[in-house]
Design a protein with these regions (language model features):
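C-terminal peripheral helix-coil segments that are non-catalytic and often amphipathic
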Residues: 64-77, 102-146
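Amphipathic alpha-helical packing segments from all-alpha helical-bundle domains
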Residues: 6, 30, 51-102, 109, ...
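Phosphate/oxyanion-binding loops and surfaces in catalytic or ligand/nucleic-acid-binding neighborhoods
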Residues: 21, 35-42, 77, 96-99, ...
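Hydrophobic alpha-helical connector segments
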Residues: 9-41, 51-65
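Alpha-helical DNA-contacting segments of helix-turn-helix folds
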Residues: 1-7
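Secondary-structure edge/capping motif, primarily at the C-terminal ends of alpha-helices
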Residues: 18, 46-50, 100
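Short linear capping/connector segments at secondary-structure termini
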Residues: 45-54, 134
Length: 146
């Protein structure tokens, strides 16, 4: 629980800083970059083990509204696709972590390159996928392996 609580607090701090310091059109992209740069934030947030015992529900309840505010600001500014939802941003962080774990030891920077491709996919001008976004309930199950 302490790992999840610490990661949640750090991610909340990043979100608050981004909301105060960053122009709305850049907020989503800066939030994700800062989370990736703070391993205590995104590593715990994308590992299953720490999320047991209700940690996922508490953390998601605390974080998704803040992520939603950042996302809505970018969507209002026209820099983020209107079909993106908060869980898409969490999945983006999970994806960057997976690439980092698989590739960065042998090819440093691969996850950063992938991150930039992923961020470009959040921008307007792309077709809405046929698949629906992951729901909060599904995200909770993924994080806790239940």
């Amino acid at each position: 629980a302490a790992v999840v609580d610490g990661a949640t607090d750090r991610t909340r701090q990043i979100a608050d800083e981004v909301l105060l310091e960053v122009a709305p059109g850049d907020a989503v992209f800066e939030f994700i970059r800062r989370c990736v740069d703070a391993p205590s934030s995104w590593r715990a947030a994308t590992s299953r083990r720490p999320w047991s015992g209700g940690g996922a529900d508490r953390a998601l309840a605390a974080m998704l509204p803040l992520i939603g505010r950042i996302l809505e600001a970018g969507q209002r500014a026209g820099t983020v696709r209107p079909d993106i939802v908060p869980s898409d941003l969490v999945v983006t962080l999970m994806s960057v972590r997976a690439i980092g774990d698989l590739c960065d030891a042998d090819a440093p920077g691969t996850s950063r390159r992938f991150l930039e491709f992923a961020l470009d996919g959040l921008r307007p001008g792309h077709r809405t996928p046929d698949q629906p976004p992951m729901s909060v309930k599904q995200l909770g199950r993924v994080l806790t392996d239940r």
